[in-house]
Every structure is written in structure tokens, then in C-alpha cells.
């Protein structure tokens, strides 16, 4: 099942200068009420599935599709709602309902910063929260401070597993986010859970070698570009947190061909 579209626990966050809780605006209260209402309307189906959220400035949809294919290769029933653009609360909860009816036990969803800021994901049980990257601000992207503030709404929802990019320039800020059960990282650093050892870029694809402890494995994708290596590593880290073998990870990533993806 594939869709394509154009709370507060502060112990892991930087301490504020004041102990006073920030005042919730009327707009935010309305957004949260709408999210709760839609969840109830559809019978709160996400409680019977595991929710994987991928956020970041770029690559969210690519990582989500990689994870979708990996889970399929692992024999899981999985639905994906993937876009590098925005997402509406009504669309998200309808997706959960249809995924549940289709028998899915995993939902993989992209979580853009504006949707997080607008409380689209309010009240949801997050199994995995993964961060791709933060690119330098432009006319269409927020500052690091506002981006971090938006992203924190996802990581304050007590995700069981957190996946972070050690190669990102803002990793020192994001490293404050930890999972209630597990935290994994990926990148070229020796300390990364999934370490990027080397990569080869071709005209019609990308190949990369990774390490998971003493286990070495290779992934190849139809997608091209240096950033694809990081996206594969992110997907591999998410899959590793779900106890999926490296062979299955490689198979799933190889199976993703964007030309074959159709909207459900």
C-alpha cells in the first residue's frame, strides 16, 4: 500500500531560560483538538500499527520508500505515505484508517517541519523517529533555530527509537534527542551505528559499503547522487532498529525504483 502526495517530555531537550511552560496559542489548541477528533472519528487505528516517521529538510520521501521496500522484503505488511511536501491532518488519519483496513502492521510516514509545527502529528504513538538532515536556510527553509523547534515536537512525543545523522552539521543540537528504548546514528563517523565506509556513483545508480559493528554489507540503488548514500544509511539504521538483517536491507533498497511507484 503506497501513497504519494505533491506531551511534553523535556528532559532530553535544552533547558529553557524560564521554568514557565510556554503558553499554547488558540490556533495550536484548535489544531490539536482537530487531530484528536480525527483520530477518534477513524477509531484510532494507529494504535494497532507501528508508526515510523521520517523528518528532515531533504530526502524524507526517499528514505520512507527505502524503508517501505525493506519491510516488504522482510515479509511485513506496510503502508507508506511519502512526500517531501506538506501533509494535512485529515489525509494522515484517513491514511491510517485505510492502512489498518488493508492489514498493515507498519506505517511509514514523512513528517515535514511545517506539519509538525501545525500539530498534524499531535498525540500519535511514534515507534521510530528518524532525521535525515538540515540544509542551510534559504527563502523557502526555516532557520536552524526554528527548524529545531519544529522538529522537537516529534522528538518530544517519546518515540521508542530515534535515528540521527552524525554527518549533519547540526548533529550536536539534534543529539539531545534520544529514544525511550534505543538511539541509533548513521554517517561516516566511527561512532555511527551504521557507518558509511565508501561509495561509488554511477550514471544510473549508487552503490555504498556500510558497517554495522563487525558486519560489512553493500547496498545499491537506482537513484543517483552523493546524498543517496546518506539516505540508504538512514534507511538501514531504521531497519536495524527493527531487527531486520543486512541482507534484507540490501534487498529492499535495491527493490525501490521510483519509476514503479504509483499512488494508491
Model-based region annotation:
Residues 38, 91-92, 147-151:
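Amphipathic coiled-coil/heptad-repeat helices and related helical stalk/stem segments
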Residues 47-49, 102, 108, 125-264:
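Acidic, Mg2+-coordinating active-site environments of NTP-dependent enzymes
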Residues 62, 66, 115-117, 170-174, ...:
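Phosphate- and divalent-cation-binding pockets in alpha/beta enzyme and binding domains
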Residues 116-128:
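ATP-dependent NMP and nucleoside kinases share a basic, alpha-helical "lid"
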Residues 89-115, 119:
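Conserved nucleotide-sensing/catalytic segment adjacent to the nucleotide-binding pocket
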Residues 2-55, 62-76, 94, 191-195, ...:
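Short, basic phosphate-binding NTP loop
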Residues 75-86:
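Short beta-strand-centered segment that lines the nucleotide-binding/catalytic pocket of NTP-utilizing
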